[in-house]
Amino acid sequence: MSEVRVRENETLDSALRRFKRQCAMSGIMSEVRKREHYDKPSVKRKKKAEAARRKNAKK
């Protein structure tokens, strides 16, 4: 869980910006999106294979 304490003489906007950056760096939002809906194991395998195919095509 990301936690940001508002510093002395710090605006709420800058504290919110720090919090958002911290969440992005820790990968919280991507994890939430990934767990938002259940994916069957077969669908997970298909997505993984497609990602590998895209990665190899990029090279």
Swiss-Prot record:
Residues 43-59 have a biased composition (Basic residues). Residues 32-42 have a biased composition (Basic and acidic residues). InterPro entries: Ribosomal_bS21, Ribosomal_bS21_sf. Belongs to the bacterial ribosomal protein bS21 family. NCBIfam families: S21p. GO terms for cellular component: ribonucleoprotein complex; ribosome. GO terms for molecular function: structural constituent of ribosome. It comes from Clostridioides difficile (strain 630). One of its GO terms (biological process) is translation. This is Small ribosomal subunit protein bS21. The gene is rpsU. Residues 32-59 are annotated as: Disordered. PANTHER family: MITOCHONDRIAL 28S RIBOSOMAL PROTEIN S21, SMALL RIBOSOMAL SUBUNIT PROTEIN BS21. The keyword Cell membrane does not apply. It holds the Pfam family Ribosomal_S21. Keywords: Ribonucleoprotein, Ribosomal protein.
